[in-house]
């Protein structure tokens, strides 16, 4: 099955035309919301409501994001039907942290939040099959749903 999606940068605030431009997409991924240069999280939550397709957070340490805003980020993601992307590119510490932190794994498992696995593969030499397989196997083992 082939899906159509778009990864949307949030540094700076994205264009207002995107919700309409993505009406027929299967999903959108908003990236780097844990970055201090990103769109304000409260503003993001309002803006996300304009999108008709599924939405996820990419390149984002959701635990760090929750701490930054003093929020129960898991509840907010669940209540707003937002999934999380676990990115295996090797550029994000949160990926390795999640793979080795059983407490965080249990939090996500118990929350029921869907998790996707991304790779940031732009050409075949970047394809990290082992990491993608490992992340997917962990999600299956924990019965964490896909989006």
Where are these regions (language model features)?
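His/Asp/Glu-enriched short active-site or ligand-binding loop at hydrolase and phosphoryl-transfer sites
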Residues: 81-94
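Extended substrate/RNA-proximal surfaces in nucleic-acid metabolism proteins
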Residues: 1-82, 140-144
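C-terminal domain-boundary segment and adjacent tail
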Residues: 122-124, 141-147
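Short secondary-structure boundary segments
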Residues: 32, 86-89, 119-120
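Short acidic/histidine-rich active-site segments
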Residues: 113-127
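Histidine/acidic-residue-rich catalytic or RNA/ligand-binding cores of hydrolases
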Residues: 66-74, 94-108, 124-139
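Conserved beta-strand edge residues that scaffold enzyme active sites
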Residues: 9, 90-91, 122
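General beta-strand structural signal in soluble alpha/beta enzymes
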Residues: 2-4, 86, 117
């Amino acid at each position: 099955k082939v899906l159509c999606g778009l990864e949307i940068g949030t540094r700076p605030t994205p264009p207002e035309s995107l919700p309409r431009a993505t009406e027929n997409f299967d999903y959108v991924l908003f990236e780097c919301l844990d970055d201090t240069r990103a769109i304000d999280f409260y503003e993001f939550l309002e803006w996300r409501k304009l999108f008709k397709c599924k939405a996820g957070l990419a390149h984002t340490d959701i635990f760090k994001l929750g701490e930054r805003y003093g929020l129960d980020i898991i509840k907010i993601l669940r209540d707003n039907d937002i999934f999380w992307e676990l990115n295996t590119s090797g550029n994000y510490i949160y990926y390795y942290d999640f793979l080795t932190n059983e407490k965080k794994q249990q939090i996500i498992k118990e929350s029921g939040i869907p998790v996707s696995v991304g790779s940031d593969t732009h050409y075949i030499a970047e394809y990290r099959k082992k990491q993608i397989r490992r992340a997917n196997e962990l999600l299956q083992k924990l019965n964490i749903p896909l989006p």
